[in-house]
Amino acid sequence: MLARAARGTGALLLRGSVQASGRIPRRASSGLPRNTVILFVPQQEAWVVERMGRFHRILEPGLNVLIPVLDRIRYVQSLKEIVINVPEQSAVTLDNVTLQIDGVLYLRIMDPYKASYGVEDPEYAVTQLAQTTMRSELGKLSLDKVFRERESLNANIVDAINQAADCWGIRCLRYEIKDIHVPPRVKESMQMQVEAERRKRATVLESEGTRESAINVAEGKKQAQILASEAEKAEQINQAAGEASAVLAKAKAKAEAIRILAGALTQHNGDAAASLTVAEQYVSAFSKLAKDSNTVLLPSNPSDVTSMVAQAMGVYGALTKAPVPGAQNSSEARRDVQTTDTSIEELGRVKLS
């Protein structure tokens, strides 16, 4: 009777403490199955059996047989993944900003024996451990890093929980931060900082665009000048090559004409033909001067055409300054030279008409 009264009093105290803390253990809500000798354990559950108050064994899923009176099912542990909402709590960052943060915890019981005898309420213990670990990890980071390094923060919390909860037979699979609430003033300052950062980026992008545009324009002008100079260079080279070709062609033609003329002069009466040609050109030059300009070069006797022809032939002889090839004798060459000297002396001065 005293034992029953003590157990009843303990149950009432436990229920009162549970109601005061706002949590309900899973084992208390579902109750424990009775020993009916033949038991069927559901899949993904582990029943902890005590014999005469001491741990006896863990019932596996399926058919199991127990001894009446001696054996008692003391704990029922679920081996499924358990989802626990971590209540919202306050935490202070490295730069002394107070945050309100909550999360979701995913865990699984790996050892039913440790989960039954290692801790009174494993779920509640893990929840409290997650809260303390989260406060500790947030104290190592500044406010900006809390938002940037959210994944690494979750991983650090999981590692810390697994190290502490190993003796409880529980493994934390993952932890996710749900919401992070900052004070209104801090939120306003963060918004201003974001706007300033955006304006800064816009200004930088605009300046970079202007810079690239100026570079492109300068590069275009440079390329245009280079292409223009190369085109001018090519044009000058082509023009010079054309002029050189023309000069060479004229020189070749003139040389060929001189060779032909020299060959003609060596023939019979070639000197006489050359003298006649020079005389004709001499007379033609005087006629052109009279047509093109008011300046006229008058011979000593303009009415005597014969004297003009003689003067022209004298000029021809002076230019040759040598006996004409094919002449009959040297006396004729001397006579031509004398005639040239006389003709040169008879040339008149330039007079204005």
UniProtKB/Swiss-Prot annotation:
Keywords on record: Acetylation, Cell membrane, Coiled coil, Cytoplasm, Cytoskeleton, Lipid-binding, Lipoprotein, Membrane, Mitochondrion, Mitochondrion inner membrane, Phosphoprotein, Transit peptide
Gene Ontology annotations of biological process type: CD4-positive, alpha-beta T cell activation; intracellular calcium ion homeostasis; lipid localization; mitochondrial protein processing; mitochondrion organization; positive regulation of interleukin-2 production; protein complex oligomerization; proton motive force-driven mitochondrial ATP synthesis
Record-listed N6-succinyllysine modification sites: K145
Gene3D superfamilies: Band 7 domain
Source taxon at top rank: Eukaryota
Subunit note: Forms homooligomers. Interacts with MFN2; may form heterooligomers. Interacts with PHB1 and PHB2; recruits them to cardiolipin-enriched mitochondrial membranes and stabilizes them. Interacts with CACNA2D2.
Subcellular location: Cell membrane; Mitochondrion; Mitochondrion inner membrane; Mitochondrion intermembrane space
Membrane topology: Peripheral membrane protein; Lipid-anchor
Gene for this chain: Stoml2
A Gene Ontology molecular function term of the record: GTPase binding
Chain positions found as Phosphotyrosine: Y124
Protein name: Stomatin-like protein 2, mitochondrial
PANTHER family noted in UniProt: STOMATIN-LIKE PROTEIN 2, MITOCHONDRIAL
InterPro entries: Band7/mec-2_domain, Band_7, Band_7/SPFH_dom_sf, STML2-like_C, Stomatin_HflK_fam
Organism listed in the record: Rattus norvegicus
Role summary: Mitochondrial protein that probably regulates the biogenesis and the activity of mitochondria. Stimulates cardiolipin biosynthesis, binds cardiolipin-enriched membranes where it recruits and stabilizes some proteins including prohibitin and may therefore act in the organization of functional microdomains in mitochondrial membranes. Through regulation of the mitochondrial function may play a role into several biological processes including cell migration, cell proliferation, T-cell activation, calcium homeostasis and cellular response to stress.
Residue ranges that the Swiss-Prot or TrEMBL entry lists as coiled coil: 215-252
Phosphoserine modifications at: S17, S330
Family: Belongs to the band 7/mec-2 family.
First and last residues of the transit peptide: 1-28
N6-acetyllysine sites (modified residues): K145, K233
Region (Disordered): 324-353
Keyword RNA-binding found: no
A single GO cellular-component term on record: mitochondrion
